[in-house]
Amino acid sequence: MKLPKEGDFITIQSYKHDGSLHRTWRDTMVLKTTENALIGVNDHTLVTESDGRRWVTREPAIVYFHKKYWFNIIAMIRDNGVSYYCNLASPYMMDTEALKYIDYDLDVKVFADGEKRLLDVDEYEIHKKEMQYSADMDFILKENVKILVDWINHEKGPFSKAYITIWYKRYLELKNR
């Protein structure tokens, strides 16, 4: 499949382990694609939940997906600084319909002041039993929490101020064409 190009708009679909559609984002603007990663931006993007509820994102957010890591990263650009919402999730795949991944419940939130929180541990434990996550899957996800926290602590990739500056600036250039 041909990779989307800078400035293209794509749909993002999040699924659960049992194959059910969890959430859809319409019209994410692509900023960069490589063989293994995609960087995009959501800005007033329509989001549809599995129960049909719809809402629109409030602020620009740079999104980062990778084919080798079991997480994706959303950097929300707010007046008080950048905060992050990180989903523990399968590496993404693309088809002609959308960028797709499986959401594995665990999330790491990083507030603009640097505080970190691991979220939805109870939901993860419930779904682990209900959807029968394997021991290998559990290990992979927990190891990727460690990798993610290391990235946060060392300001790697999307957690670097320079990264946010570069990609937000590029988004503004593309948006104003």
UniProtKB/Swiss-Prot annotation:
Disulfide bonds: none annotated. Mg(2+) 1 binds at residues 87, 103, 107. It is an enzyme of class 3 (hydrolase). The keyword Magnesium applies. The keyword Hydrolase applies. Its cofactor is Mg(2+). It catalyses: a ribonucleoside 5'-triphosphate + H2O = a ribonucleoside 5'-diphosphate + phosphate + H(+); a ribonucleoside 5'-diphosphate + H2O = a ribonucleoside 5'-phosphate + phosphate + H(+). The active site is at residue 23. GO terms for molecular function: magnesium ion binding; nucleoside diphosphate phosphatase activity; ribonucleoside triphosphate phosphatase activity. Its EC number is 3.6.1.15, 3.6.1.6. It comes from the Bacteria. InterPro entries: DUF402 (IPR007295), FomD-like_sf (IPR035930), Ntdp-like (IPR050212), SA1684 (IPR016882). Keywords: Hydrolase, Magnesium, Metal-binding. Mg(2+) 2 binds at residues 105, 107, 120, 123. Has nucleoside phosphatase activity towards nucleoside triphosphates and nucleoside diphosphates. NCBIfam families: PRK13662.1. Belongs to the Ntdp family. PANTHER family: PTHR39159, UPF0374 PROTEIN YGAC. This is Nucleoside triphosphate/diphosphate phosphatase.
